């Protein structure tokens, strides 16, 4: 089995369905003797360029270990899901379990916002 990093972009109107989509894809991998090493929901972010007249979308990253048949089935699921705007599958040499640089940035932004609200609350 090989290791893969998958990033897919979901239509912003379908953001509330992202947890169910993640669960469905995780179940697909694990049901065929694969492993899910990391799941990161990066949230709604600004895209580099417009896709279908949309400037923002919901980003999700998965690090999995699976066979070629499972990967083909996942790719098929991405292609025929209208909510998935784009997907990228990259083969990696080993399982990545540490937070990605993107997730570290998201955590930094959340910490900064939390710090701002506490300082604003103290100032009032």
Curated annotation (Swiss-Prot):
Gene3D superfamilies linked to this entry: 3.30.70.60
Top-level lineage group: Bacteria
Family annotation (CDD domains): bS6 (cd00473)
InterPro entries (alphabetical): Ribosomal_bS6, Ribosomal_bS6_sf, Ribosomal_S6_plastid/chlpt, Transl_elong_EF1B/ribsomal_bS6
Gene Ontology CC terms: cytosolic small ribosomal subunit
Key words of the record: Ribonucleoprotein, Ribosomal protein, RNA-binding, rRNA-binding
Polar residues composition-biased segments: 115-124
Sample GO molecular function, one term: structural constituent of ribosome
Biological process terms in GO annotation: translation
Family per record: Belongs to the bacterial ribosomal protein bS6 family.
Role this protein plays: Binds together with bS18 to 16S ribosomal RNA.
PANTHER family: MITOCHONDRIAL 28S RIBOSOMAL PROTEIN S6, SMALL RIBOSOMAL SUBUNIT PROTEIN BS6M
Name listed for the protein in its UniProt record: Small ribosomal subunit protein bS6
Provenance organism: Cupriavidus necator (strain ATCC 17699 / DSM 428 / KCTC 22496 / NCIMB 10442 / H16 / Stanier 337)
């Amino acid at each position: 089995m090989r290791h893969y990093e998958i990033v897919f972009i979901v239509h912003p109107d379908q953001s509330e369905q992202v947890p169910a989509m993640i669960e469905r894809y995780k179940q697909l991998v694990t049901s065929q003797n694969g492993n899910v090493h990391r799941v990161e929901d990066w949230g709604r972010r600004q895209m580099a360029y417009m896709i279908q007249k949309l400037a923002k979308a919901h980003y999700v990253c998965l690090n999995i270990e699976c066979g070629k048949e499972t990967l083909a089935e996942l790719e098929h699921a991405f292609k025929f899901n209208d909510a998935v705007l784009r997907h990228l599958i990259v083969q990696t040499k080993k399982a990545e379990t540490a937070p990605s640089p993107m997730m570290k940035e998201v955590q930094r932004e959340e910490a900064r916002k939390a710090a701002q609200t506490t300082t604003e609350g103290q100032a009032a």
